[in-house]
C-alpha cells in the first residue's frame, strides 16, 4: 500500500468536506416542489400545469421511465435526459439521490480544476485551490437551491453542466498540447455517449457550444489533424441537441402556454436577472480584466498564450449564455448556472497561468483578513442554512405524518400554517441558500394535486 502524502490527505479532506456539505443539506430537503411529485408518476401526455388524473400511476421500473420519457418528448419538451434522470431518482429512495448529487458536485469541482490545468486529468491538485472553487460554488450562485438541492432542478442544470465539461476535456487537452495528446479507441464511443448526454442539456448553452465546435473542427480539418474521437463527440452532441430542440413536445408546450421565442423580447424580469448576475460575478470580471492587462507576463510562460485565449473563450461563452436568454419567454435565475460556471472557469484558468508565471494580477492588501472573512461568511451562512433546513424538515414531517394517516381515504389534507422563516430576511441571512416550499394555497393547483395523488389522499 502506497502511503498518502500530506498534500493528498489535504486534497481528500477538502473533497470530503464539499461532499458532506451538499449531502447534509440534501438529506434535510423535503419533497415540496410540485415538479418532484409530477415526475414521480407516468407522464400522462397533457400539460404539466394540469392536475394529474385520479388514476395516475407511479413509476415502478426502468420500462416505465423509458415509456414516460418518450411520452414527455412527444407532448411537452426535449429534455428527455434530464427528466429521465429525475424520474429515476424519484423512483429510488431519497438517499440514492443525496449521495449521487454530492458526488456530482465533487466531480464538478474536479472538472473545473482539470479544465484550469489545460484539460489534464490529475489528482495533483492543491487542496487550497479545491476549497476556493467549492467556496465559489457556494457564494456566487444566483439560485443555489435550484441547482444543488432541488431534485428536478439539479437534473436539468447541474448534471448537464458536468456532462458538458467532461465532454470538453479532450478537446481542451488537444488544443493546449497542439494535438500531441493521444487517446485509445475507447474515447470515441465514450465521447459519443457524453455528447448525447451533454447535447440534450440546456438550450441557451448548447447552441453556442455547437457553433464554436464547428469552427474548431473546421480549423482542425484544415490543419489535417482530424481524429475519429473528435467527430464521434461532435456527432453525439449534435444528435442530443437535435432531440432537445426538435422535440414535438416543444411546439405543444408553446401552444398551450402561449409562450414563444422572439427577437428583442426583453422584460423587466430579464433585466433584473442580468443585473443581479452581473453584480454577483463582478469580482471575477474585475479579476479577469486585470489579468488580461497582464497577458504579456502570462504569455511568457510555456503555453501561456493558450491559457489566455482559452480563458477569453470561456468568458465570451459565459456572456453569450446569458445574453441569449433575452429571447426566452422564461428567465429563471437557475438558467444562469452555465454562465456562472464558465465565468468561474475562466478565472481559474487565468489564476493557474498567473501561478505558473509567478505573477499576481490583483494585489490585495490584507489578503489574510479576506480569507478569514470568507471563512466566517461560509460558517455563518451554512449554519443559518442548516438551521432553516432543519426547521423546514420538521414542519414538513409534521404534515407528512398527517398525509400518511389519511392515505387511501378521500379526506383532503388542509395545511393550516405556512413554513417557518419564509420572510425575505432569512434569504439574506442564509446568503441566498434559502428555498421556498412549493405547496400553494390554491387546492386545485397542479402541484398540490400531484402531492395528493402521491400520498393517495383526497384532492382536486
Which ranges hold each PLM region?
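Short, Lys/Arg-rich, polar N-terminal cytosolic tail immediately upstream
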Residues: 1-6
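Signature aromatic-anchored transmembrane alpha helix within multi-pass, membrane-resident enzymes
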Residues: 187-188, 296-311, 355-383
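Membrane-interface transmembrane helices that cradle and orient dolichyl/undecaprenyl
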Residues: 164-186, 223-224
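Alpha-helical transmembrane segments
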Residues: 10-23, 128-135, 233-238, 316
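Transmembrane alpha-helical segments
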Residues: 105-116, 163-175, 210-218, 283-288, ...
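Intrinsically disordered, polar/acidic, low-complexity terminal segments
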Residues: 7-76, 90-110, 117-124, 371-460
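Transmembrane catalytic cores of multi-pass membrane glycosyltransferases
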Residues: 27-99, 151, 187, 194-319, ...
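Membrane-interface micro-motifs in multi-pass membrane enzymes
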Residues: 125-175, 275-279, 319-350
Amino acid at each position: 500500500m502506497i502511503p498518502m502524502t500530506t498534500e493528498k490527505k489535504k486534497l481528500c479532506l477538502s473533497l470530503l468536506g464539499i461532499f458532506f456539505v451538499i449531502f447534509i443539506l440534501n438529506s434535510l430537503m423535503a419533497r415540496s416542489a410540485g415538479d418532484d411529485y409530477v415526475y414521480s408518476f407516468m407522464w400522462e401526455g397533457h400539460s404539466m400545469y394540469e392536475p394529474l388524473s385520479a388514476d395516475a400511476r407511479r413509476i415502478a421500473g426502468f420500462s416505465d421511465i423509458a415509456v414516460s420519457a418518450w411520452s414527455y418528448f412527444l407532448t411537452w419538451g426535449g429534455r428527455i435526459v434530464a427528466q429521465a434522470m429525475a424520474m429515476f431518482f424519484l423512483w429510488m429512495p431519497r438517499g440514492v439521490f443525496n449521495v449521487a448529487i454530492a458526488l456530482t458536485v465533487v466531480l464538478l469541482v474536479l472538472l473545473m480544476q482539470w479544465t484550469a490545468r489545460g484539460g489534464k486529468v490529475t489528482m495533483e491538485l492543491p487542496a487550497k485551490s479545491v476549497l476556493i472553487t467549492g467556496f465559489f460554488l457556494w457564494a456566487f450562485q444566483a439560485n443555489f437551491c435550484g441547482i444543488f438541492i432541488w431534485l428536478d432542478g439539479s437534473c436539468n442544470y447541474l448534471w448537464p453542466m458536468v456532462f458538458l465539461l467532461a465532454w470538453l476535456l479532450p478537446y481542451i487537452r488537444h488544443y493546449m498540447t497542439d494535438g500531441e495528446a493521444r487517446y485509445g479507441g475507447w474515447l470515441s464511443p465514450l465521447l459519443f455517449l457524453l455528447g448525447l448526454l451533454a447535447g440534450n442539456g440546456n438550450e441557451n448553452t448548447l447552441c453556442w457550444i455547437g457553433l464554436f465546435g464547428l469552427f474548431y473542427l473546421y480549423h482542425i480539418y484544415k490543419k489535417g489533424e482530424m481524429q475519429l474521437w473528435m467527430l464521434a463527440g461532435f456527432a453525439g452532441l449534435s444528435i442530443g441537441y437535435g432531440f432537445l430542440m426538435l422535440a414535438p413536445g416543444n411546439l405543444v408546450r408553446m401552444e398551450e402556454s402561449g409562450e414563444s421565442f422572439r427577437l428583442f423580447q426583453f422584460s423587466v424580469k430579464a433585466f433584473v436577472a442580468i443585473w443581479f448576475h452581473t453584480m454577483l460575478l463582478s469580482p471575477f470580471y474585475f479579476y479577469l480584466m486585470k489579468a488580461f492587462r497582464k497577458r504579456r507576463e502570462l504569455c511568457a510562460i510555456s503555453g501561456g498564450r493558450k491559457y489566455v485565449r482559452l480563458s477569453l473563450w470561456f468568458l465570451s461563452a459565459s456572456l453569450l449564455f446569458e445574453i441569449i436568454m433575452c429571447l426566452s419567454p422564461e428567465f429563471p435565475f437557475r438558467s444562469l448556472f452555465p454562465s456562472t460556471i464558465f465565468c468561474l472557469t475562466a478565472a481559474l484558468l487565468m489564476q493557474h497561468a498567473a501561478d505558473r508565471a509567478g505573477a499576481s494580477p490583483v494585489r490585495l492588501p490584507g489578503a489574510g483578513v479576506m480569507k478569514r472573512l470568507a471563512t466566517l461568511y461560509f460558517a455563518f451562512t451554512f449554519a443559518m442554512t442548516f438551521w432553516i433546513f432543519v426547521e423546514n424538515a420538521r414542519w414538513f414531517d409534521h404534515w407528512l405524518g398527517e398525509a400518511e394517516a389519511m392515505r387511501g381515504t378521500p379526506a383532503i389534507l388542509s395545511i393550516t400554517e405556512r413554513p417557518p422563516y419564509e420572510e425575505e430576511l432569512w434569504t439574506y441571512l442564509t446568503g441566498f441558500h434559502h428555498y421556498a416550499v412549493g405547496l400553494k394555497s390554491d387546492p386545485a393547483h397542479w402541484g398540490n394535486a400531484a402531492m395528493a395523488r402521491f400520498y393517495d389522499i383526497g384532492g382536486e
